[in-house]
Each structure stands twice: as structure tokens, then as C-alpha cells.
Amino acid sequence: MSPQTETKASVGFKAGVKDYKLTYYTPEYETKDTDILAAFRVTPQPGVPPEEAGAAVAAESSTGTWTTVWTDGLTSLDRYKGRCYHIEPVVGEENQYIAYVAYPLDLFEEGSVTNMFTSIVGNVFGFKALRALRLEDLRIPTSYSKTFQGPPHGIQVERDKLNKYGRPLLGCTIKPKLGLSAKNYGRAVYECLRGGLDFTKDDENVNSQPFMRWRDRFVFCAEAIYKAQAETGEIKGHYLNATAGTCEEMIKRAVFARELGVPIVMHDYLTGGFTANTSLAHYCRDNGLLLHIHRAMHAVIDRQKNHGMHFRVLAKALRMSGGDHIHAGTVVGKLEGEREMTLGFVDLLRDDFIEKDRSRGIFFTQDWVSMPGVIPVASGGIHVWHMPALTEIFGDDSVLQFGGGTLGHPWGNAPGAVANRVALEACVQARNEGRDLAREGAEIIREASKWSPELAAACEVWKQIKFDFEPVDKLDKTK
């Protein structure tokens, strides 16, 4: 008799409530290559043993419920249940544990991040026996990742489309983010691209408001792109935000962008949802559009250390759902992001194979096989003095995005773009000559400013601007 139809008549049904750990805590279990593995930070309620808490997470995120049910006998729980197979205390934290859970692959629909998250981070996060719960990391088996298209194009294809190699790409978010007319918005796009940037960007909440409807914005931005390309001889782009109230409207906007001949569109993947994002990613691959992803709302989910979901999980999910760029923090700017932790999930976005490394917050070895990589975007409170650090931290396969750091230049938008391009070219040249960007960065920028008045003016404006705050979410102590 098959496991799917096997009954437990020989055992008999016994109604009632029993501890989760009797069924779902299995420290002897050896994980399979096909299992999805999860690392949860568990804070049990007082009096709840860690084994019971970990087992409860495994149960409530897979086959379990609060009481024994008769229909358990109509299937094989051993085949389908999640298993808490290891628990370790968190060093330096009281009553906090990392619980490792293995999920059989058959629990998940192929190619659906939506279904994966509905199971793993669904109801269990409101479970009363837990004071707090955080999903720290996932191991996605190759047998599951191969059911996803992933990024529409990936890093190498994007470079080939843009014909730009050997340096980070430069971007700028148009400010003020709300209130500009479509024509004035397009003017700012043109000035920034003409000044030397590769991309400009809609902000995450620019959709289709009364002051600037999406179609008008798309048309004026396309005009700006073509004019800047003609004058500079470089391929340019603007992230046209296709995010909308319905999937149908979102695709309609992407179709219009394709008809205009622009190279890239944008989506807010958390507020828009994974189903919408995956649909847009498939459209972009089929129609030759790059896809920029904004992570608006991520800090609601990932900023608190004890509860929610770490961004490295959201980053993996985005790579599976599909996107060619995603915002990933800056380390040095105004937004949250510890260096080693940020570099950990940057590698998870870009690389094919990433080894387990707890010093960078990576709980599992991850093999993406042939799935294309995602370019991390550094954006938020950065300016020309940050350029050496950003170039050193993120390397060539990145987008460095200066919004206020371009449009806030005292001479205007185009000079702001010139300043950033000169600073970047100086840093890349210095690095290629063997200079130490971390140690000599300020001197490299000062030297470049001697022959670039635009850069000199930018250096003067932002010479004392720093964002010196401790990150809320830090790596755990190792001992």
C-alpha cells in the first residue's frame, strides 16, 4: 500500500492533545539533499522547553495542529511532516535558541515562493507558546530551485545589454519623490543621465498619482533616455515603476514600457507580492526587459532581531521569484546594515555557490546551480565621500545609487551626476593600479577633485555628513 493511502488502523485512533516534541522533535533525523532546511530563532514562553518550542514550529508550519485528528490515519505523517532536527542556544542571549527544521519537498508547490512562505512563515508566527520567532535562513535544495525561472536576465546578460564592464553602475533616485509633474520629472532624468549616470529611478511610491500619471511619466522619461543616449553615446535607462493595484494593470504598464523601447522596469516586490513579482519577471524575460526590484516594507519584516524574517531570506526568495537588481543596504549610508551581514546576503544574491559561514550570518551552504545572479543596489544617504568604501565593499557587480547625493549638488543635477561619475572612475582607476581604497579613499577623492570642479563642490557640501548609528540587527556572538 502506498504511503499516501496507508492507514494507521493497526495503531488505532487516540483522541486528545499530546506534546509536539513526541512527533516533531527528531534529533536522530539525517537531512536529505531534497529537504528545504530552515533556521529559526526561537524565544519560548517561560516554562516551555526549547525542544517543545522547536517541535511546535515544525508542526505548525507543516502537517501539525493543536490536537490529534482522525485524518492523520489517512496519510503518512513520516513522509510529510516537518522535523525539528537540531536545537542550539544563542550565545549571549537568555532563553533564545536556533531551531533547525527540515521540510520534505513534497509540501511545496513547484515554482511558487508564495506557497513556500505561506507554509513556512504562515500561522506559526502568531503561536502563543512562543514569545518571538524569526526565520534566519533557508537552504533551498537544487531540486526545488530548478523549478523557478529566477532573474529575468542576470548579471552577465545585463552587462552585455548595456555594453558596460569593469566598474559598478551608477544610479540616482529622482527627488522629490512625489509632487513633480511628468515633464519636470523627465527633465531631471535627462540631466542626470547626460551628466554620466547609467540609470535613474522612480522612487518606490511613484506609481500613478494625480500629479503625475504613469503613462505621462513613461513617455517623458523615454524621451529623456533617448536624448541622453544620443548626446553621450552610452546606453542609459530609467527604472519605470510598473507596480500597480492589480497584476493586470502592472503588466499593462510593462507592455507600454516595452513598446517605448526602454531597457528596464521596476517593481516593489514585497508590497506588490510574490505572485505579481514572479509574473512580471516572466514577462520581462520573454520581452527583453531588465527588472529592478525595490524592497519597500522590508524593515517591517526584517529589522527586529528576535521576530520576523531576516533579509537574507527575502533576498533568496527574490532571486527565486525574479529580479535583476535589488536594494541591499549600503553599510555606510543612512539605512540599516552591518558590513559582514550585508556582504553575506550580497553573496547569496550574486554567487552560484555560497558556503555556510556563521561569521557572516549564513546558516546553510547554498547551491544555486545555473540560476542567474542578482545585482545588489547600494542606495540611501550616500555621497561622493562614500565612493571608495562602496567600490571596495560591493565590487564591480553592483549599482551605486545616489539620490540626494546627485540632485543635492549645489550646481544642479547634471553637475551632481558628473561629480559621482568622476569619483567612481577615480576609485576604479586607483583600485586597478593597486591602491588601497579602504585606507587611501579620502586622498583618492581629494586628488580627483583637483581636476573636477563638480566633484570639488560636492566634496565641500558633504564633507561632514555621517550617519553614525549602531545597527539594530547584529550578528550573533560566536562564543
From Swiss-Prot:
It catalyses: 2 (2R)-3-phosphoglycerate + 2 H(+) = D-ribulose 1,5-bisphosphate + CO2 + H2O; D-ribulose 1,5-bisphosphate + O2 = 2-phosphoglycolate + (2R)-3-phosphoglycerate + 2 H(+). Binds 1 Mg(2+) ion per subunit. Signal peptide: none annotated. One of its GO terms (cellular component) is chloroplast. Its cofactor is Mg(2+). The basic functional RuBisCO is composed of a large chain homodimer in a 'head-to-tail' conformation. In form I RuBisCO this homodimer is arranged in a barrel-like tetramer with the small subunits forming a tetrameric 'cap' on each end of the 'barrel'. The active site is at residues 175, 294. Pfam families: RuBisCO_large, RuBisCO_large_N. One of its GO terms (biological process) is photorespiration. Belongs to the RuBisCO large chain family. Type I subfamily. This is Ribulose bisphosphate carboxylase large chain. It is found in: Plastid, Chloroplast. The keyword Thylakoid does not apply. Substrate binds at residues 123, 173, 177, 295, 327, 379. Residues 1-2 form a propeptide. GO terms for molecular function: magnesium ion binding; monooxygenase activity; ribulose-bisphosphate carboxylase activity.
